[in-house]
Amino acid sequence: FLGNIRAALITAMVIPLSMLFTFTGMFNNKVSANLMSLGALDFGIIVDGAVVIVENAIRRLAHAQHRHGRMLTRAERFHEVFAAAREARRPLIFGQLIIMVVYLPIFALTGVEGKMFHPMAFTVVIALLGAMLLSVTFVPAAIAMFVTGKVKEEEGLVMRKARQGYAPVLE
């Protein structure tokens, strides 16, 4: 999907929006924004769900355009993106929940350890929750609205060269 600038921008938008969600949660729960609370945030994990939804939507849009032999209408585009989001929603949610569950034991810590690590765990869980919500709501809607025109699912030069290199080894 990186060949499609709109899809890449929609995926990238999840980072500031989930950070807004995170800072709102931190402010409402009086968690200070410091190195300990924000240090564990990993933008790769935050955009993971969005990447899954965007990849699936682009794949379905490209296949639908190829199948019809023309550009999709707005209704067809919305239908394909909805189907793509529905298809990827459950694995995405379970994957994000598994990562969130890893942080639950940290909430059982007491004393100095609890005071040190609670803000970090809270911040990561809130960021992942925000990213997950955005991935199943904002991302499909934005893809359906803004990814118009000819959609191609193609490998980039790097992937083609890598495939040429390792395909003979596998055979």
Feature roles, as predicted:
Residues 1-171:
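Hydrophobic regular secondary-structure detector
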